[in-house]
C-alpha cells in the first residue's frame, strides 16, 4: 500500500500547478461606469507567456496557474489586466492610464470562451413575432438565437404598426421584428444578411400626397400647402401592380409596378451609444430606405455587440429613389433571410450587394456628408478587395433625419480584376 500512496503524494503538487488552457477566442466585457464594453479577446500561449489581441490592440502577458496578467497599449492609452481564469471564464480588474492626462481609471472585467460552431447542417427557423420594437437597442432581449448559415422566415408590420390583417399591433414609427442573436458574432465581425425572399402578405398599402421639406423650394411649398393627406393603394399581388383606391380623374388609369423592399435592416449600435429610434439610420444600418434592399440582395453590417442583434422591418411594396413624399407604399411583409458571418472584417458604412452591383451606403445629416460617406465607403471596399475607383452615384434617402447616398459600381466592370483578398466566411 505504501507505493501507491507515495505515487499520489508526488504528482498531486504537479496537478495543482498545471496551467489553465486559455488559448483561443474569448468575449471580454469591461464594465466602464456601468457601460459594458464588449471586445474580442484572442490569446496565444507559449509556456507561461501570453500574446494576442484585445479588440484592435495587441497584448502581452503571463499566465501563472489560475492567475492571468496582460497589458494592452495604443497611441491613446495603456491598460493592465489582472484576474483569475478557468477553462471557460475569467474575472478580474483593469487599470487604464490615459496617455495624455495620465489619469487612472479602475474597472472590472469578465470574459467567456466563445463556443464552437454547433454540429449538423444549417437550420431553417419559422418565427412568429408577438412584440415589435421601436429602437435598435442592445438591451432588448433577443427573440431568437440563430447560427451563421441559418435561415429565418418571419413577418413584419408596416410603418404604422399594422400587420397583414390590418390589426394595429404597436405604435407607428417603423416598428421592427427582432432582435435576432447570431451565435459566435463578435464586435469587429461583419454580418451578411442575404435577403432570400420578400413577399407581400396583404392587398393594400398606405402613402402620402406631399413632398418632404428637404426637397421643396418656396414656390413648390406654396403649391403643396393643402397636401399632407394619406393615400391608400390597392396591391394586385398577381400582376404585381398598384392603383390608388380613390384616384383623382388624372390618376384613374395610373398604375405603379411593385418591387418589394425592406426599409430597415439594422444591428444594435456600439459601446456607450444611445439606442437610436427606428426612424434613424447610421453605420449600424437601420432605416436606410434604400430601394436596392430587395429579394436577392445582401446587406453587410458591422457587428458592434455580441450576437449582432439584427432587426428587420419597414416593408415597402415599392419605393422610388429618395422616398420624396415621406413614405413609400408602406405595407406588412413576409420576410426570409439567411445569415453569414465574416470574422474580423471592418467596414465604416453599410454595404449592399446585388447580383449585378456592389453598393456603399452613405448616411449623414446632409446630402454632402452622405455623399462623402458613400464615396469613402466604396473606396474602402475597392481598396480592400479590388483597388479600383468608384463610378456611379444614386441618392437613396432624403425623407428622414439622415440623408442617404448610395455609390453603385457594376460588377461586370470588376470581372477582369482578381480579388485582392478573399473574404473568409465562417464555416456553416
Q: What residue ranges belong to the model's regions?
A:
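N-terminal, Lys/Arg-enriched amphipathic/low-complexity engagement segments
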Residues: 120-168
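Intrinsically disordered, low-complexity linker/loop segments enriched in Gly/Pro
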Residues: 197-293
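Central antiparallel beta-sheet cores of small beta-barrel/beta-sandwich binding domains
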Residues: 19-105
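Conserved mixed alpha/beta catalytic, RNA-binding, or beta-rich assembly cores of soluble enzyme
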Residues: 258-287, 291-368, 379
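Short, structured beta-strand/loop micro-motifs enriched in basic residues and often containing a Trp
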Residues: 128-137, 169-176, 276-284
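Short, Lys/Arg- and Gly-enriched loop/turn segments at beta-strand edges
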Residues: 159-170, 198-208, 307-317
Amino acid at each position: 500500500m505504501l507505493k501507491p500512496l507515495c505515487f499520489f503524494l508526488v504528482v498531486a503538487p504537479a496537478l495543482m500547478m498545471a496551467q489553465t488552457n486559455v488559448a483561443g477566442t474569448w468575449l471580454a466585457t469591461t464594465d466602464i461606469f456601468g457601460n459594458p464594453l464588449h471586445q474580442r479577446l484572442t490569446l496565444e500561449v507559449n509556456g507561461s507567456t501570453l500574446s494576442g489581441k484585445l479588440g484592435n490592440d495587441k497584448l502581452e502577458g503571463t499566465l501563472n496557474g489560475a492567475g492571468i496578467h496582460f497589458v494592452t497599449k495604443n497611441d491613446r492609452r495603456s491598460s493592465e489586466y489582472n484576474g483569475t481564469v478557468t477553462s471557460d471564464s475569467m474575472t478580474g480588474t483593469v487599470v487604464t492610464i490615459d496617455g495624455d492626462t495620465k489619469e487612472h481609471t479602475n474597472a472590472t472585467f469578465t470574459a467567456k470562451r466563445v463556443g464552437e460552431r454547433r454540429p449538423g447542417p444549417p437550420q431553417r427557423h419559422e418565427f412568429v413575432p408577438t412584440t415589435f420594437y421601436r429602437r435598435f437597442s442592445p438591451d432588448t432581449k433577443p427573440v431568437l438565437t440563430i447560427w451563421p448559415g441559418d435561415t429565418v422566415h418571419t413577418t413584419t408590420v408596416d410603418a404604422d404598426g399594422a400587420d397583414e390583417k390590418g390589426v394595429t399591433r404597436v405604435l407607428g414609427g417603423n416598428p421592427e421584428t427582432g432582435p435576432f442573436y447570431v451565435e459566435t458574432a463578435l464586435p469587429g465581425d461583419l454580418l451578411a444578411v442575404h435577403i432570400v425572399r420578400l413577399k407581400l402578405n396583404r392587398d393594400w398599402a398606405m402613402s402620402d400626397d406631399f413632398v418632404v421639406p428637404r426637397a421643396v423650394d418656396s414656390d413648390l411649398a406654396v403649391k403643396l400647402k393643402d397636401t399632407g393627406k394619406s393615400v391608400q393603394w390597392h396591391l394586385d399581388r398577381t400582376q404585381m401592380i398598384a392603383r390608388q383606391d380613390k384616384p383623382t380623374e388624372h390618376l384613374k388609369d395610373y398604375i405603379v409596378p411593385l418591387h418589394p423592399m425592406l426599409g430597415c435592416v439594422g444591428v444594435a449600435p456600439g459601446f456607450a451609444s444611445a439606442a437610436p429610434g427606428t426612424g434613424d439610420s447610421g453605420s449600424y444600418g437601420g432605416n436606410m430606405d434604400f430601394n436596392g434592399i430587395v429579394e436577392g440582395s445582401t446587406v453587410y453590417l458591422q457587428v458592434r455587440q455580441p450576437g449582432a442583434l439584427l432587426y428587420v422591418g419597414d416593408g415597402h411594396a415599392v419605393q422610388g429613389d429618395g422616398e420624396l413624399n415621406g413614405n413609400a407604399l408602406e405595407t406588412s411583409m413576409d420576410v426570409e433571410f439567411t445569415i453569414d458571418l465574416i470574422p474580423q472584417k471592418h467596414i465604416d458604412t453599410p454595404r449592399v450587394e446585388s447580383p449585378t452591383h456592389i453598393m456603399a451606403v452613405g448616411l449623414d445629416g446632409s446630402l454632402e456628408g452622405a455623399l462623402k460617406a458613400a464615396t469613402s465607403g466604396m473606396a474602402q471596399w475597392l481598396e480592400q478587395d479590388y483597388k479600383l475607383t468608384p463610378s456611379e452615384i444614386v441618392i437613396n434617402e432624403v425623407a428622414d433625419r439622415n440623408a442617404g447616398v448610395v455609390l453603385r459600381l457594376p460588377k461586370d466592370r470588376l470581372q477582369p480584376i482578381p480579388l485582392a483578398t478573399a473574404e473568409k466566411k465562417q464555416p456553416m
